[in-house]
Amino acid sequence: MDMVDRTSRRGYRDWFVQRITALLSGIYAVFVIVFLLVHHPISYPQWHALFSHLIMKIFTLIVIFSILWHAWIGMWTIFTDYVKNKPIRLALETLVCLLLVGYFVWAIEFLWIAR
């Protein structure tokens, strides 16, 4: 019985995290859409100025991290539900994890290092 409780808590946590990450993504999308509508037609200097602010870089990085976390929970759930062969599931999970980490590193490079 104890095992069922731990599983249900993890399921609830995953459900909750997906709702929070979706909310963050939605807030970010609304902000960007409003910015685009207010500054129509937008120029490159305006776009660059928006993403040059420290707060926007931090917010963008948080949203990217939350999207990747959201994706990880979704892919983990799909693999757990549909891939019954454990070595194949582990290989797929490892591949997805490496890709998501790579995407996050790429986002950091794009936001903070690239000029």
UniProtKB/Swiss-Prot annotation:
It is a multi-pass membrane protein. One of its GO terms (molecular function) is metal ion binding. Keywords: Cell inner membrane, Cell membrane, Electron transport, Heme, Iron, Membrane, Metal-binding, Transmembrane, Transmembrane helix, Transport, Tricarboxylic acid cycle. It comes from the Bacteria. Pathway: Carbohydrate metabolism; tricarboxylic acid cycle. It is found in: Cell inner membrane. Membrane-anchoring subunit of succinate dehydrogenase (SDH). Its cofactor is heme. This is Succinate dehydrogenase hydrophobic membrane anchor subunit. The chain crosses the membrane at residues 15-35, 58-79, 90-113. Residues 36-57 are periplasmic. A ubiquinone binds at residue 82. The gene is sdhD. Residues 1-14, 80-89 are cytoplasmic. Pfam families: Sdh_cyt. InterPro entries: SQR/QFR_C/D, Succ_DH_anchor, SuccDH_FuR_B_TM-su. Heme binds at residue 70.
